[in-house]
Regions:
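Glycine/small-residue-rich loop that forms an oxyanion/phosphate-binding "nest" at active or ligand-binding sites
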Residues: 71, 80, 85-90, 104, ...
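Iron-sulfur cluster-binding cysteine motifs and their immediate structural context
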Residues: 31-38, 57-75, 86-102
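Short glycine/proline- and charge-enriched loop/turn segments
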Residues: 262-270
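Conserved AdoMet/S-adenosylmethionine-binding subsite of the radical SAM
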Residues: 106-262
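N-terminal pre-triad scaffold of radical SAM enzymes
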Residues: 4-57, 74-83
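Conserved small/polar residues in nucleotide/adenosyl-binding loops
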Residues: 274-280
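A short acidic, glycine-rich active-site loop
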Residues: 190, 269-273
Length: 282
């Protein structure tokens, strides 16, 4: 299992002060994704062109001769590159980085346990995020059970795009889900997120009917889901759920992921989206 980030002292990923573990791999491909390095389950190389000083240190250090310095910056031959990470280690300008570090459950627990004093004093815990953590049910459940044995509050930030039996197993081993509701129309959901939404909505209803705690977030994106029809359908669906706490966060669109797509060399925003103002959201 590869992890692409560990965020300490997180305060927006559940109650209290938390440590958030970002797992690589996601079955969705949302066109506005702000963590595109979390979509692939494998290691990836990120290159920040504006940091590069053209010193050729990485070119000379690469054991596979996969790098070339051009007027456009460093070009990587994907057929040669083994993602060994030497280029990132030697780069004096920090223009190269490898996204994805392989962790065992024991190693991740050591990282989590370092934060216990902050968790205890703030009634915080650990949040498993992604990517999509439910894409790795075996390692995820192992970690959730280990945290449960330590009395650590457990949250899972998930799309809920997973087999119902996986959702049930995870639900039995965590205290909180953090779930996005992106688009009620299944065809539009498939267009903008890469998969239809029937499984997601069915799993969300199952979680609600089990009276399991969850926070709901709706990213509002003009041209995707911020229209009156989708908002009305979203409200009607949520009102139909046997849901006690009813915590809904409306998230305005941002383009933080743009720079990450540039580093990965992937396409960002095939459609131009508009930033919604707070008065518009209200």
């Amino acid at each position: 299992m590869f992890v692409f980030d560990i965020k300490r002292y997180a305060i927006n990923d559940g109650p209290g002060i938390r440590i958030t573990i970002f797992m690589k791999g996601c079955p969705l491909s949302c066109v506005w994704c702000h963590n595109p390095e979390g979509i692939s389950s494998r290691k990836q190389k990120l290159y920040t062109k504006k940091k590069c000083i053209g010193c050729r240190t990485c070119v000379e250090a690469c054991p596979e001769q996969a790098l070339t310095l051009t007027p456009e910056g460093i070009v990587t031959d994907g057929a040669r590159c083994t993602l060994c990470g030497i280029c990132a280690e030697v780069c004096p300008a920090l223009a190269m980085e490898i996204s994805g570090t392989e962790y065992s459950a024991e190693a991740l627990m050591k990282e989590i346990e370092k934060e216990i004093v902050f968790m205890d004093r703030s009634e915080g815990g650990v949040t498993f995020c992604g990517g999509e953590p439910l894409l790795h049910p075996g390692p995820l459940l192992d970690l959730l059970r280990r945290c449960g044995e330590r009395g650590i509050h457990r949250a899972v930030d998930t799309t809920l795009f997973a087999r119902p039996e996986i959702v049930r197993d995870v639900m039995d081993n965590c205290e909180l889900f953090l779930v996005d509701l992106k688009q009620m129309d299944s065809a539009k959901h498939a267009k903008y997120c890469g998969v239809p939404n029937e499984l997601i909505l069915s799993n969300l209803r199952m979680v609600a009917e089990a009276r399991h705690d969850f926070y709901l977030r709706i990213p509002l994106i003009e041209g995707v889901n911020a229209d009156e029809e989708n908002i009305t359908r979203s409200a009607a669906f949520l009102a139909s759920l046997p849901w006690e706490h009813r915590i809904v966060n409306l998230l305005p669109y941002h383009d933080i992921g743009k720079s990450k797509h540039e580093k990965l060399g992937t396409v960002y925003n095939p459609v131009s989206y508009t930033h919604l103002t707070l008065p518009t959201i209200a």
